[in-house]
Amino acid sequence: MKKKILFLGVGGIGVSALAIAAKKLGADVAGYDSIPNKLTIKLESLGISIFSSPNNVDVSGYDMVVYSSAILDNHPLLSKARVLGVQCLKRAMFLALLMKDFRYSIAVTGTHGKTTTSSILATLLCKLDTTNSFVVGGVVKYADSNIQINGTDRLVIEADESDASFLYLNPNVAIVTNIDLDHMSTYKNSYDNLLENFANFLMKESIENIYLCVDDHGCNDLLDKYRSRVVGNIVSYGFAINSDARIYNYRVSDNLTTFTVEYKSGKYDFELQLPGKYNVQNATACVVACLDLGFSYKDIYNALATVKGVARRFDVYDKQISSHKIPVIDDYGHHPVEVTSSLGAVRDRYPNKKIIHVFQPHRYTRNRDLLIDWPKALSLADQLIILPTYSAGEQIIQGAESQDLIRNIPKVLLADSFDHVLYFLEKLVDDNTVVLIQGAGDITNLVGMIGE
């Protein structure tokens, strides 16, 4: 990749990964972001020039400009690049171009769990074969990075459905974790349109194998409607008895999850450090894909047992609140399905503990679109503490604020700040408590405010 490339919005997790990948593959790379952060500092340490003011950037000196979804069409650097005739690509369009440098690519998509699943697969493949690489949407704990380029053999990528940008990609293998109602403005608020876009992605001629979780209603709806039009070989996985790769013997003990997968003529036992049935589903997609790639069961078993997942997905910390030493869990979940799955995993791992759930809703549009689903999900803990909604740049929508999500939930407290949450926790926590701190906004900062 012998090009001079400018990445706009390079402080984001997705674009920063592409900038590093491009540099590793031989491109001359620079980046722009108006707000420096840990990622831009990391990029500078790798020899990538970072600009924080448009006035300091000469766009005419670049062959290509790659931009994130956070960069508006009227951004001065993007506008000038277009006037000058510089090739301008959205992040996913550049990812599609990057994939062509690799012999084989595996894309993981789905409404929930795609970052965790792609991180599990990335860890497995990099442990099974040191020539494998990945570019995903979260920090993979195995590598302490969202990107690792070890050559140009196999590449694991996370394919984003939120803006339908996965349609730009042409992988050899696709994993679909689930299909659910989220980011529905992308799909004209139509479930049929959502299914059709997933189907169009899976109909790519490049795709040889497709792994779909048939425990999920959306994946089943897709199969019912589009199976005959999909060219690739479809492998269903899940707890459902009719799965091609069937999960059973699910057990949780202390910090270990064990399960068995029956696939083709074999029965395979596995150990996993990650909690919850949803992570067993995620892991099953990965191990079955690895079996189909020709890796041995023994090597896959050993690699999976070491997988620690991705940052901010059920990260457990030992914390002290008042005089009580308790587990505090930091989690990125921000959709009713994710909240339900996470709380189920907390119950599995800590069956005899009182669960306090601290939740920060994310986006007023999500609150509004899923208003009917929130009360059931948020009522599953023993005590809920809810924060104001993290807007992510959206305007307030009347009837879709935090207090509107908790109707008829008996044990709920409204906190107006992180300090207010800490006050509540001091009053509520005892030795038999576990705290789940959850959301996609800045709520992760609350974890650091709690004493070790």
UniProtKB/Swiss-Prot annotation:
GO cellular component, one term: cytoplasm
Keyword Cytoplasm set for record: yes
GO BP terms: cell division; cell wall organization; peptidoglycan biosynthetic process; regulation of cell shape
Pfam family, one: Mur_ligase
Class in the EC hierarchy, top level: ligase
Entry binding sites for ATP: 110-116
Catalysed reaction, written as an equation: UDP-N-acetyl-alpha-D-muramate + L-alanine + ATP = UDP-N-acetyl-alpha-D-muramoyl-L-alanine + ADP + phosphate + H(+)
Cell compartment(s), UniProt: Cytoplasm
One example GO MF annotation: UDP-N-acetylmuramate-L-alanine ligase activity
Domain of life of the organism encoding this protein: Bacteria
Main location: cytoplasm
Classification via InterPro entries: Mur-like_cat_sf, Mur_ligase_C, Mur_ligase_C_dom_sf, Mur_ligase_cen, Mur_ligase_N, MurCDEF_pg_biosynth, UDP-N-AcMur_Ala_ligase_MurC
Keyword annotations: ATP-binding, Cell cycle, Cell division, Cell shape, Cell wall biogenesis/degradation, Cytoplasm, Ligase, Nucleotide-binding, Peptidoglycan synthesis
This protein's pathway: Cell wall biogenesis; peptidoglycan biosynthesis
EC number(s) given by UniProt: 6.3.2.8
Family according to the record: Belongs to the MurCDEF family.
Free-text function comment from the UniProt entry: Cell wall formation.
Record protein name field: UDP-N-acetylmuramate--L-alanine ligase
Organism: Francisella philomiragia subsp. philomiragia (strain ATCC 25017 / CCUG 19701 / FSC 153 / O#319-036)
Organism placement in taxonomy: Bacteria, Pseudomonadati, Pseudomonadota, Gammaproteobacteria, Thiotrichales
Gene: murC
